[in-house]
Amino acid sequence: MAYIEVNQNRHLQLLLNIYEAAPDGEHYTIDGIDCYLTNEPDKAYQFIVYDCGVMQTPTSIFRDADHRLLCGSVLPYEIPVFHKALSECGSLEVRPVAICVPQEIQEYCMELFGEDVQIAAASHDLFAKRANGQIYRPLVEKYIAGEKRL
Protein backbone atom coordinates (compact mmCIF):
# COMPACT_ATOMS: atom_id res chain seq x y z
CA MET A 1 0.00 0.00 0.00
CA ALA A 2 1.20 3.49 -0.81
CA TYR A 3 0.27 6.89 0.58
CA ILE A 4 1.07 9.75 -1.78
CA GLU A 5 0.81 13.38 -0.78
CA VAL A 6 -0.27 15.29 -3.90
CA ASN A 7 -0.82 18.67 -2.29
CA GLN A 8 1.40 21.50 -1.17
CA ASN A 9 0.74 21.21 2.58
CA ARG A 10 3.87 19.11 3.25
CA HIS A 11 2.27 17.50 6.30
CA LEU A 12 3.82 14.18 5.31
CA GLN A 13 7.34 15.63 5.55
CA LEU A 14 6.62 16.68 9.13
CA LEU A 15 5.30 13.20 9.97
CA LEU A 16 8.32 11.53 8.39
CA ASN A 17 10.56 13.65 10.59
CA ILE A 18 8.55 12.83 13.73
CA TYR A 19 8.57 9.09 12.95
CA GLU A 20 12.27 9.35 12.00
CA ALA A 21 11.60 7.47 8.78
CA ALA A 22 14.59 6.70 6.56
CA PRO A 23 14.26 6.88 2.77
CA ASP A 24 14.06 3.65 0.77
CA GLY A 25 14.44 4.64 -2.87
CA GLU A 26 11.79 7.25 -3.62
CA HIS A 27 9.67 6.46 -0.56
CA TYR A 28 9.70 6.18 3.22
CA THR A 29 8.10 3.18 4.93
CA ILE A 30 6.13 3.55 8.16
CA ASP A 31 4.35 0.51 9.62
CA GLY A 32 4.32 -1.25 6.24
CA ILE A 33 2.93 1.73 4.31
CA ASP A 34 5.16 3.29 1.64
CA CYS A 35 4.87 7.08 1.81
CA TYR A 36 5.75 9.34 -1.10
CA LEU A 37 6.30 13.08 -1.17
CA THR A 38 5.79 13.12 -4.95
CA ASN A 39 3.46 11.27 -7.32
CA GLU A 40 6.29 9.08 -8.58
CA PRO A 41 5.94 5.63 -7.00
CA ASP A 42 8.96 3.43 -7.64
CA LYS A 43 6.96 0.18 -7.70
CA ALA A 44 3.44 -1.12 -8.35
CA TYR A 45 0.80 -1.17 -5.61
CA GLN A 46 -2.60 -2.76 -5.16
CA PHE A 47 -3.81 0.25 -3.17
CA ILE A 48 -2.74 3.87 -3.39
CA VAL A 49 -4.14 6.56 -1.12
CA TYR A 50 -3.74 10.03 -2.60
CA ASP A 51 -3.87 12.92 -0.13
CA CYS A 52 -5.26 15.77 -2.22
CA GLY A 53 -5.29 18.26 0.66
CA VAL A 54 -8.03 20.85 0.96
CA MET A 55 -10.63 20.37 -1.77
CA GLN A 56 -11.07 23.49 -3.88
CA THR A 57 -12.09 21.72 -7.08
CA PRO A 58 -11.58 18.00 -7.67
CA THR A 59 -8.16 17.21 -9.13
CA SER A 60 -7.74 14.76 -12.01
CA ILE A 61 -6.34 12.19 -9.56
CA PHE A 62 -9.49 12.52 -7.44
CA ARG A 63 -11.84 12.44 -10.45
CA ASP A 64 -10.15 9.37 -11.96
CA ALA A 65 -9.95 7.34 -8.73
CA ASP A 66 -11.67 3.96 -8.36
CA HIS A 67 -12.92 4.96 -4.90
CA ARG A 68 -13.28 8.54 -3.69
CA LEU A 69 -13.35 9.40 -0.01
CA LEU A 70 -13.82 12.99 1.00
CA CYS A 71 -12.42 13.07 4.51
CA GLY A 72 -12.48 16.10 6.71
CA SER A 73 -12.71 17.23 10.26
CA VAL A 74 -16.25 18.37 11.01
CA LEU A 75 -16.19 20.43 14.15
CA PRO A 76 -19.06 22.94 14.25
CA TYR A 77 -17.02 25.78 12.72
CA GLU A 78 -15.71 23.47 9.95
CA ILE A 79 -19.14 22.42 8.65
CA PRO A 80 -19.23 25.10 5.89
CA VAL A 81 -15.80 24.03 4.56
CA PHE A 82 -16.77 20.34 4.46
CA HIS A 83 -20.12 21.19 2.86
CA LYS A 84 -18.41 23.30 0.16
CA ALA A 85 -15.88 20.55 -0.59
CA LEU A 86 -18.67 18.00 -0.93
CA SER A 87 -20.63 20.36 -3.20
CA GLU A 88 -17.54 20.84 -5.42
CA CYS A 89 -17.61 17.11 -6.20
CA GLY A 90 -20.86 17.59 -8.14
CA SER A 91 -22.05 14.33 -9.68
CA LEU A 92 -18.93 12.32 -8.78
CA GLU A 93 -19.60 9.29 -6.60
CA VAL A 94 -18.01 10.27 -3.31
CA ARG A 95 -18.05 8.70 0.14
CA PRO A 96 -18.04 11.50 2.70
CA VAL A 97 -16.14 10.70 5.89
CA ALA A 98 -16.58 13.21 8.70
CA ILE A 99 -13.85 13.08 11.33
CA CYS A 100 -13.90 14.42 14.90
CA VAL A 101 -17.65 15.06 14.89
CA PRO A 102 -18.87 15.82 18.41
CA GLN A 103 -21.66 13.50 19.54
CA GLU A 104 -24.02 16.47 19.91
CA ILE A 105 -23.95 17.30 16.17
CA GLN A 106 -23.63 13.86 14.57
CA GLU A 107 -27.35 13.63 13.83
CA TYR A 108 -27.31 17.16 12.38
CA CYS A 109 -24.37 16.18 10.13
CA MET A 110 -26.27 13.17 8.84
CA GLU A 111 -29.24 15.41 8.02
CA LEU A 112 -26.99 17.97 6.32
CA PHE A 113 -24.64 15.65 4.41
CA GLY A 114 -26.99 12.70 3.89
CA GLU A 115 -27.35 9.25 5.36
CA ASP A 116 -24.25 8.08 3.45
CA VAL A 117 -21.88 10.19 5.54
CA GLN A 118 -19.60 8.03 7.66
CA ILE A 119 -18.69 9.35 11.10
CA ALA A 120 -15.07 8.47 11.84
CA ALA A 121 -13.37 8.57 15.18
CA ALA A 122 -10.24 10.67 15.51
CA SER A 123 -7.15 8.52 15.11
CA HIS A 124 -4.10 10.05 16.66
CA ASP A 125 -1.98 7.25 15.25
CA LEU A 126 -1.99 8.08 11.54
CA PHE A 127 -0.91 4.58 10.61
CA ALA A 128 -3.13 2.68 13.06
CA LYS A 129 -4.14 -0.60 11.47
CA ARG A 130 -7.50 -0.93 13.19
CA ALA A 131 -8.72 2.65 13.46
CA ASN A 132 -12.04 3.12 11.65
CA GLY A 133 -11.85 -0.29 10.01
CA GLN A 134 -15.66 -0.38 9.73
CA ILE A 135 -15.37 2.45 7.18
CA TYR A 136 -12.37 1.30 5.17
CA ARG A 137 -12.81 -2.48 5.14
CA PRO A 138 -15.85 -2.44 2.78
CA LEU A 139 -13.72 -0.57 0.24
CA VAL A 140 -11.02 -3.22 0.13
CA GLU A 141 -12.92 -6.36 1.10
CA LYS A 142 -13.36 -7.68 -2.43
CA TYR A 143 -9.60 -7.41 -2.98
CA ILE A 144 -8.59 -9.29 0.18
CA ALA A 145 -7.84 -13.01 -0.06
CA GLY A 146 -8.62 -15.09 2.99
CA GLU A 147 -9.99 -13.88 6.27
CA LYS A 148 -7.27 -11.59 7.56
CA ARG A 149 -9.10 -9.10 9.78
CA LEU A 150 -8.21 -5.43 10.00
Give the ranges of each region predicted by the language model.
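Walker A/P-loop NTP-binding active-site region of P-loop NTPases
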Residues: M1-Y28, F47
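Conserved beta-strand termini and adjacent loop/short-helix elements that scaffold enzyme active sites
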Residues: I4-V6, T38, C52, A122
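A broad, low-specificity signal for short, low-complexity segments enriched in glycine/proline
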Residues: N9-H11, T29-D34, T57-I61
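Generic hydrophobic, helix-prone segments enriched in Leu/Val/Ile
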Residues: L15-N17, C35, C109, I135-I144
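Charged, low-complexity, helix/coiled-coil-prone segments
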Residues: G25-I33, K84-A85
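Short acidic low-complexity segments
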Residues: D34-P41
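Conserved catalytic-core segment of NTP-binding enzymes
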Residues: K43-G133
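NTP-binding/hydrolysis catalytic cores, primarily Walker-type P-loop NTPases
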Residues: D125-L150
